[in-house]
Each structure stands twice: as C-alpha cells, then as structure tokens.
Amino acid sequence: MIKEKISKSRFIVIGSLLLLIGLSIFASYNIYNYYSHKVDNNKANDFIEEIKKEEPPVEIEQEEQPKEETPKEENYNYIGVVEIPTIDFKRGFFNIDDRNNNVDKNIEVLINSDMPDVTNGILAIAGHSGSGRTAYFKNLYKLKVNDEINIYYNNTKYIYKVNKNYEVDKNGIIDISRDKEQTTLVLTTCSKNKTKQVVILAYLVDKVSY
C-alpha cells in the first residue's frame, strides 16, 4: 500500500512537471510570434515613413560644434509594402531580383509581375501559410469580397478591393481568370490542408500620394 501511494505521488509530480514544461513552451512560442509580428510591422512602417517626400526647410548657415553622427538604420531594401487591415497584416516586399525576394524568407513577388503603376498590369505575391516564422499569409484565407488591400509603392498608396477568394489545385500553376482591363493584384498561399492553393484576386479602385 505504501509503495503504491509513493508511485502515485511520483506520477502526479512527474505529470505536473511535464504540464508546466508544455505550458512554458507554448507561452514562449506565442510571445516569440507576437514580437516577430511587431518587428515586421515596425520595419514596414519605417519604410513608409522613410520614403515620404517633404519640402526641405530653409536653413541659415552658422558655425556649429561638430556632432557625432548616429548610424542610420537601413530600410531593408524594400521597394514597397503590402497592408491588409482586416487581418492586421503589414509587410515589406523586395525587387524581383533581390536575393531576399524568396518565399522561404519573406513574401515573394512572382516572376513576370508588374508593379502597381503599370496600368492594367498584374502584381502577384506569394507567401507561406501554416504556423512557422515565415507563415506570413497564414490568415489570407479569411479575406472576403470588398476587403481592402493597400500597396505602398513609389510614394503612392494603391488601394485594391478583393473581387474573389478561391482555391485551385496545387500543381505549380495558378489559373487566374481576371478582367484584363483592370489593374490587378493577386495574393496566393497554400490552403490549410496543403492540397490546394488559395488565390485572392483584387482590383485597383483608387490611389493617393503620400
């Protein structure tokens, strides 16, 4: 009887320790993802602020003591930013030829894409889904018709509205049926079960300078 009680006690202690370890790992993962999301948003915001054009103030030359220069942080070579307010997404993207334009590192501008300033062109961007660090498009499937997607590029905010959210077979080819008389944005990622490709088709509705 005593041995049986000791065994049960050990089982309870071990079980409690395993539960605490599991909870700690889960909490650490969520905290890491939260701060990674904040860092991504900050990088995108830094890029948008850095490329804003402002009229330089008139300065009067005067002698000053030399100041120690603070190193300026790079803008990560982004050429633009994708913003999707309904899923709290904001992320910079790179030139097609940039080594960081890679779906395993970032969202990826697909080959033969046009930039938003090309009338009736098509900009296609892919990203991973799932739960990893680079699963930037994990919530893409939640987008609905008329949801807004903004592209910040070359000092202009291009405003798109979602026209379709659909799935196609995952075979390396994305069938895009669109109105060729409209400037188009396509965002794509894997479906939750990885057997299909989620495709978001959006059309340009407005653009404003910033």
Task: For each feature predicted by the language model, list its residue ranges.
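Juxtamembrane low-complexity tails/linkers enriched in Ser/Thr-Pro and polybasic
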Residues: 1-5
